[in-house]
Amino acid sequence: MIGLDTNVLVRFLTADDPEHSPRAHAFLHAAGERQEPLFVNVVVLCELAWNLRGKAYGYSRSDIANALDGFLNVGAFEVQHRDQVKEAVRDYRQGRADFADYLIGHLNSRAGCQNTVTFDQALANTGGFQPL
């Protein structure tokens, strides 16, 4: 198994770098051909969502959710905490908070937390969160 950094996935999705994007595509394709599992941890997914949403790329929430779903639905990608990531993507599609916020809530719930306290008003009426 090979771990992936955020910048490889950004280059793969955006094709914005004439040197790095083709290398990212070639690497991911070759790993798929070899059936080499590619590990994507939750920090990478949070950074990916943050980068794609930023000024440089300006992806919509829907486009980001679709990209995250893509990694979940392709067998070559071994996504850390896959079930919680799926739940966070679902909530991100429907809600107003950042993807990372929803993932925090689902990971905390999995760890046995009754709820997650927050100052984030976008999460005030979301299950699993309690306004502080």
Please report, for each region that a protein language model flagged, where it lies by residue.
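Active-site neighborhoods of divalent-metal-dependent phosphate/nucleic-acid chemistry enzymes
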Residues: 75-115
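Short, well-structured N-terminal submotif of metal-dependent ribonuclease cores
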Residues: 1-40, 56-62
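Histidine- and aromatic-rich ligand-binding microenvironments
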Residues: 5, 39-41, 97-98, 120-121, ...
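Short, conserved alpha-helical segments within structured domains
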Residues: 40-44, 81-84
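Acidic, PIN/NYN-like endoribonuclease modules and their adjacent C-terminal/linker elements
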Residues: 1, 105-132
